[in-house]
Design a protein with these regions (language model features):
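C-terminal segments that line or cap access tunnels to active or ligand-binding sites in enzymes
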Residues: 214-224, 279-281, 286-458, 464-489, ...
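Glycine-rich active-site loop/strand segments that organize a redox cofactor
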Residues: 37-71, 145-153, 201-203, 207-213
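Conserved Rossmann-like nucleotide-cofactor binding loop
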Residues: 12, 35, 289
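N-terminal Rossmann-like FAD-binding beta1-loop-alpha1 element of flavoenzymes
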Residues: 2-29
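Glycine-rich FAD pyrophosphate-binding loop
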Residues: 21-47
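Active-site/ligand-binding neighborhood in enzyme catalytic cores
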Residues: 141-264
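Dinucleotide-binding Rossmann-like beta1-alpha1 core, especially the glycine-rich loop
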Residues: 50-141
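Active-site-proximal substrate-binding core of FAD-dependent oxidoreductases
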Residues: 497-547
Length: 547
């Protein structure tokens, strides 16, 4: 039995372990943190539980599962949970609301049923939208989405990788409302300004999410029906260990030793002892900013493309969460709220309404009735209370600033949705560290951003080092986005590369095409793609024609 050591136990590492253990490999995983799951994990608000109750649930950031996810959804269906699977813990949202400083909440449907009433809501949302968009704005955005939809893969990968989203949609020539909404959403989606994010990533995702919101069927996004580790990660870890995976928590990888073009061992510290781990194959499942530090001269000599990973170390931004525990349940909307005017690019979800089987009276001091989980995607723009960016604020100031920005966005036109006296307590992601009061805070887990031109720096899941494989969201994938889906797909690609290297007869992991924009499983755009591919090969620009 061949042995595989996986360095890093987040979604990528656990996905790789899952696919390997069911194919008969011996698998060991070494995870630095005390809680499994990486960025996806939920975590306790330590010390909040009293009189035998559990600590309140906190998280790095709320989890969501867009309709277009394929790889991670398939994995959820293969993790046992009680009498079913973890997949059964997904629950649909029905709304996506936009909050501004100047108008009441604008509801967008997240799930559209076949009815005239709902169809009219979509029309009204798009054309009588209260966001200041003109018909010219809407037509321009539609034209640009159509361009992405009808462009060939080669053009998207080679040409649009070199164009930022702002320039691609010609935002300079459009209204301030257009710029704020259609250019600004990249900050919320990928924690990256539209003048930096490449169109190869943003374009297909923007099209896919627009189609998912505006076409009937499953909700465009689903959530778990409880804290992530309770409903997914912990059952997954139990399953992996039951299958034979040797999963180590609080095990710090110190170095990876490459000699004569192959990996000889990895050095790990656990329980105060440092030791070498050896295997037939190694999967590095670290995020890019960590992996960059482990790449040695010997590794680069064996595979010069690994220099690209080192270049990507700075292609990260911050997207971290804060949870507000409330004295009463405050649904706000049955889904997510995007705070369009909030300088810190906030999104939130009121979680208790999606957690029917979670009794919050068994948490904290027993009086919490609701959890408002907020993601902060802009840490560099000054806020409304202190005139400072989030990076320069204390934890207490971040709490106050985010709360104030939400109140400004929700309490509009006489409506009072969010009041100070409903706040019980709060929890800021522990990845945000305040080591020196006189300096900016630091972030232990930033998020990869796909800057213009960075596709060329991203590696495949296999390397020129025959026993080293990569599984993380910076790896080249069809998903092409720093997400759980991208991490899971990268893990599958790493496992498939091991199977190939091993000459294994085991069935490879399934890899899905993404962003195919099919309707009823029919690729209606295929003729356009063929036409554009012929033009691209001749060096001609996209023209959107069929022939």
């Amino acid at each position: 039995m061949k042995k595989v050591v996986i360095l890093g136990g987040g979604v990528a590492g656990m996905s790789a372990a899952h696919e390997l253990i069911v194919r008969g490999y011996e698998v060991s995983v070494y995870e630095f943190k005390s809680i499994p799951g990486g960025k996806a994990r939920s975590m306790p608000f330590v010390g909040s539980g009293t009189d035998g109750r559990k600590d309140l649930p906190g998280e790095h950031g709320f989890r969501l599962f867009p309709r277009f996810y394929r790889h991670v959804i398939d994995t959820l269906k293969r993790i046992p949970y009680e009498n079913g699977t973890v997949y059964d813990n997904l629950t649909e949202v029905t709304r996506l609301d936009i909050a501004t400083y100047t108008a009441p909440l604008l509801p967008l449907l997240a799930k559209i049923e076949f009815s005239l009433d709902n169809f009219m809501v979509v029309i009204r949302d798009l054309f009588d939208n209260g966001l200041g968009l003109s018909m010219d704005d809407l037509e321009q955005y539609g034209r640009k989405l159509w361009q992405v939809m009808t462009s060939c893969d080669e053009r998207i990968r080679e040409e649009y990788n070199l164009i930022d989203w702002w320039n691609f949609i010609e935002a300079d020539q459009q209204s301030p409302a257009f710029q704020k909404i259609f250019a600004g959403f990249t900050k919320t989606l990928v924690a990256c300004q539209s003048k930096i994010a490449n169109t190869q990533t943003v374009g297909p995702v923007a099209v896919q999410m627009t189609l998912d919101i505006t076409t009937p069927g499953t909700s465009f996004v689903r959530l778990l029906n409880g804290p992530t580790n309770d409903k997914w990660v912990n059952p997954w870890l139990i399953f992996l260990r039951d299958q034979g995976v040797d999963y180590h928590l609080e095990a710090k990888v110190e170095s990876i030793d490459c000699v004569d073009g192959v990996i000889r061992s990895a050095k790990v510290t656990e329980n105060g002892k440092t030791f070498e781990v050896e295997a037939d194959y190694y999967i590095a499942a670290f995020p890019v900013e960590v992996m960059g530090k482990f790449i040695t001269d010997a590794m680069v000599q064996a595979d010069p493309t690994l220099v690209g990973v080192q270049k990507l170390v700075d292609s990260v931004a911050w997207m971290n969460g804060i949870q507000y525990y409330l004295k009463e349940e405050l649904p706000i909307t049955h889904g997510h709220v995007i705070y369009l005017d909030a300088p810190w690019s906030l999104t939130s979800v009121s979680q208790k309404q999606f957690w029917p089987d979670v009794d919050l009276s068994q948490y904290g001091d027993g009086t919490v009735k609701g959890v408002l989980s907020v993601d902060i995607s802009d840490w560099d723009t000054p806020g409304v209370l202190f005139g400072k960016s989030a990076t320069l604020c204390t934890a207490e100031e971040i709490k106050a600033e985010v709360w104030a920005q939400m109140k400004l966005s929700l309490n509009v036109d006489g409506a009072v949705i969010l009041e100070d006296d409903v706040l019980h307590s709060w929890f800021l992601d522990t990845d945000i560290q305040f080591e020196n009061p006189d300096q900016a805070c630091t972030n232990m887990e930033p998020l990869l951003i796909n800057r213009v031109g960075t596709w060329d720096d991203r590696p495949e899941a296999y390397t020129a080092i025959p026993n080293l494989f990569l599984a993380a969201d910076y790896v080249r994938t069809n998903t092409n986005l720093a997400t759980m889906e991208g991490a899971n797909e990268a893990a599958r690609r790493a496992v498939n590369a091991i199977l190939k290297q091993d000459g294994s007869a085991e069935e490879p992991c399934e890899i899905w095409e993404m962003y195919t924009f099919e309707f009823m499983h029919i690729d209606l755009l295929k003729p356009y793609h063929h036409h554009d591919k012929r033009r691209f090969e001749k060096g001609l620009p996209w023209d959107g024609e069929l022939f």
